[in-house]
Amino acid sequence: MARLGVNIDHVATLRQARGGTEPDPVAAAAIAEFAGADGITIHLREDRRHIQDRDLKILRQTVQTRLNLEMAATDEMVAIALSVKPEACTLVPEKRAELTTEGGLDVRIHQEALKLAIEKLQAGGIIVSLFIDPDPDQIKVANKIGADYIEIHTGSFAEAKSWKEEELELIKIENAVKLARKLDLGVNAGHGLNYNNVKKVAAIGGIEEFNIGHSIMSRAILVGLDRAVRDMSELVRYA
């Protein structure tokens, strides 16, 4: 049975739009956990456009499930992670001009820097995942440099323009899961998943956790966060 990690970045985005104190991502995390979330995911970006250092520090004290910190593999972020000690860190690519994370890490090009970050984080007792496209070469290098997990970038599947294209992307994801499992890598997935498409990916099997944010927060505006999390949790667990 797969787990659901709820990404609360968009709660912080709404707060930062006015530069005030509400809505508070810390409160949203508590509601999500009460509703059945298995973990809370946040992305502390270098430009601090949504989640702030204050959020991370308080969430480390209040999250009762598990805290997953998405971050760039920079010296600053590694130092922050080692001081806060989330259960897991997911290393992601980061561009200041992007609206959200676009595509997976190119582990082949950046393997030396990623390997160093992985080693430092693991030495601090933190589980490390790499956010990558469902590409066999990327998975093999992720394993080579010592990652504990991969998180499969499901954006191409979510943005497929036709049934045929969607099926091809599902096959890529399924093959990626099989390869990762063969290499003893844990597997998570996320990006672009919503209430209409997540069951197709969850039905593949072998994916331990789905990290979902935008779709849950969009639904929460209409039905409330508790209901939105419960509905997504049911889809993920019983696909």
Curated annotation (Swiss-Prot):
Keywords: Cytoplasm, Pyridoxine biosynthesis, Transferase. The record marks 151 as: Transition state stabilizer. Pathway: Cofactor biosynthesis; pyridoxine 5'-phosphate biosynthesis; pyridoxine 5'-phosphate from D-erythrose 4-phosphate: step 5/5. The keyword Ligase does not apply. GO terms for cellular component: cytosol. It catalyses: 3-amino-2-oxopropyl phosphate + 1-deoxy-D-xylulose 5-phosphate = pyridoxine 5'-phosphate + phosphate + 2 H2O + H(+). 1-deoxy-D-xylulose 5-phosphate binds at residues 9-10, 45, 50, 100. The active site is at residues 43, 70, 191. This is Pyridoxine 5'-phosphate synthase. It comes from Geobacter sp. (strain M21).
